[in-house]
């Protein structure tokens, strides 16, 4: 059975998760933000995913979530992505943001599996808000799926933007069809340094229809950390990355079609490190090609 190494395990075993802080200043360089194509509103380019990390509504999880959200904000971030199907994540997020009075500081995105008005009502109640910033149709699988109801809700002020999501390459044909026809404000897709299928299809189409792109599972569900276990960050990468986490995120942000990356974490130190990917230079096309070659050589 293969040994599974989490990011926490990796950080401990590496004995030095971060490269020297002199490599890249984390606070005195401009924050990387990206414009939402349909509105030109700018949002910070690193957010927070909540799948599997905030799914239990208990005191321990709420305390952890509060620390992570505070780390996101301190790092310059605003975007938090959740879903009605992520266990108790909406409830945890709602309680944490309400208790700390953080709602107006955040860009909240959630997802529904279908245009069900009652499920929307329950999501808003769990999030303790009357409006979300982004409402997404989750896990698009059919070319016939529509955003008609979502647009109605947008017109009613329930959300500011609408989007679609998928993390399955077999569903890309359906995603492409809905993206072309519905022209949503956002598409959320699986995209990582070792999973680049979206570069050939979804990203070009998103640019064509002026949809923002959110990248889910940017660490490939932990695959990338397992690949680099026991390896030091190459010297050539230290000009733009302070850690392996930033290396992986900055590959994605090096593509200007990507609006934001949304790695999930329940660890505030990892959130701080993730937010650091919004500081300092991004890799240029030649450096991105070298990053691909490096990962493919492992």
Regions found by a protein language model. Give the residues of each.
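Generic structural signal for well-ordered alpha-helices
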Residues: 33, 69, 90, 94, ...
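Conserved, mostly hydrophobic/aromatic
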Residues: 36, 48, 80, 93, ...
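Short amphipathic alpha-helices and their capping/turn segments at secondary-structure boundaries
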Residues: 30-41, 124, 200-208
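Structured C-terminal cap/extension of enzyme domains
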Residues: 17, 201-298
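N-terminal binding-site loop/beta-alpha segment at the start of enzyme catalytic domains
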Residues: 2-104
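Glycine/proline-rich, positively charged
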Residues: 57, 114-188, 192-197, 201, ...
